[in-house]
């Protein structure tokens, strides 16, 4: 028996609408995207606009991949983050599917400031976000 090849997920119009809602209207703090049974990228969860950073980590499944678009707000403004969540305990097939979806989304969604790939919560701690947006001094 052969393992089916991962397919490139189609991005649902809902994903693009929610992305615009984050980017231009600050309607959400973030969205978690998943690939459904029909290989469509769909919105799994939304994070409220004025939510706490801890809500992001609490929303992540421990054994499933997700793509997250997250607006991180700081004293210097806000930045959009594209996060690939592939925990070590997720099935390898899912990691391949989401890896392909990550490429498709990165091309489609314009205006992302930073990208993060994470397999554990330490890799998406608030300090990681702060380090990404803080200008480096020489």
Swiss-Prot record:
Compartments (UniProt record): Cytoplasm, Cytoskeleton
Domain ADF-H: 7-134
Signal peptide feature range: none
GO cellular component, one term: cytoplasm
Keyword Manganese applies: no
Keyword Cytoplasm carried by entry: yes
Annotated Pfam families: Cofilin_ADF
InterPro entries (alphabetical): ADF-H (IPR002108), ADF-H/Gelsolin-like_dom_sf (IPR029006), ADF/Cofilin (IPR017904)
One of the record's GO molecular function terms: actin filament binding
GO BP terms: actin filament depolymerization; actin filament severing
This protein's UniProt keywords: Actin-binding, Cytoplasm, Cytoskeleton
Record-stated family: Belongs to the actin-binding proteins ADF family.
Function in brief: Controls actin polymerization and depolymerization.
PANTHER family for this protein: COFILIN-RELATED
Official protein name in the record: Cofilin-3
Gene source species: Dictyostelium discoideum
Gene symbol of the encoding locus: cofD-1
